[in-house]
């Protein structure tokens, strides 16, 4: 499930249609499938944050760093839940979503947009990722990428990152050094 994480919903739907029906998806099909997917995710109920991610975010924020969300998702419920679960951490003007890019991950565009909008030099920025496509995107943008294994992937799946951590706690200990 993490293999396509980070891609825009449209690109996943187009690829699936090519594989299943040997043709591109029409705009109405993309809209319908995406709406059905969003409704399904909404039915799953409450989502829970990755263990100890709040500690990482609070540490990064307390160090004075900007925190950006770079996601291939266009689901407004996801963005709203980020604000509900992590109040005062995320700012809407520091989010790059599927609505902001032409090319999703693994293309560098999402991370390049966040970097450009941050106004910071690249050496002052880093990416925290949990999926291979996001790692590739961050690296292609010329950024340092830290990967945290949050699911079923192997360390090898995340090996393109500059450093791989087995948990948010491990990442937090590294960041505090």
Model-derived regions: residue spans:
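Alpha-helical substrate-recognition element adjacent to the catalytic core
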Residues: 1-21
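Hydrophobic/aromatic residues within well-ordered alpha-helical segments
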Residues: 4-9, 33-37, 74
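Conserved donor sugar-nucleotide recognition element shared by glycan-biosynthetic enzymes
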Residues: 9, 49, 107
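Metal-dependent phosphoesterase signature
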Residues: 17-55, 63
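Asp-based, Mg2+/Mn2+-dependent phosphohydrolase catalytic module
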Residues: 54, 58, 74-177
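Structured helix-beta-strand junction loops
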Residues: 63-64, 160
């Amino acid at each position: 499930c993490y293999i396509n994480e980070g891609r825009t919903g449209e690109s996943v739907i187009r690829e699936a249609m090519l594989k299943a029906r040997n043709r591109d998806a029409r705009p109405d099909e993309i809209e319908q499938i995406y709406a059905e997917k969003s409704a399904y995710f909404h039915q799953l109920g409450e989502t829970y944050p990755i263990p100890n991610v709040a500690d990482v975010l609070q540490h990064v924020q307390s160090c004075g760093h900007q925190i950006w969300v770079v996601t291939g998702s266009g689901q407004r419920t996801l963005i709203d839940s980020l604000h509900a679960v992590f109040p005062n951490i995320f700012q809407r003007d520091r989010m790059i979503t599927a609505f902001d890019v032409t090319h999703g991950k693994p293309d560098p565009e999402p991370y390049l947009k966040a970097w450009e909008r941050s106004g910071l030099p690249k050496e002052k920025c880093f990416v925290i990722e949990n999926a291979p496509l996001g790692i590739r995107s961050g690296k292609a943008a010329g950024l340092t990428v830290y990967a945290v294994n949050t699911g079923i992937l192997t360390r090898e799946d995340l090996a393109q990152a500059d450093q791989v951590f087995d948990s948010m706690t491990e990442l937090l200990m590294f960041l505090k050094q």
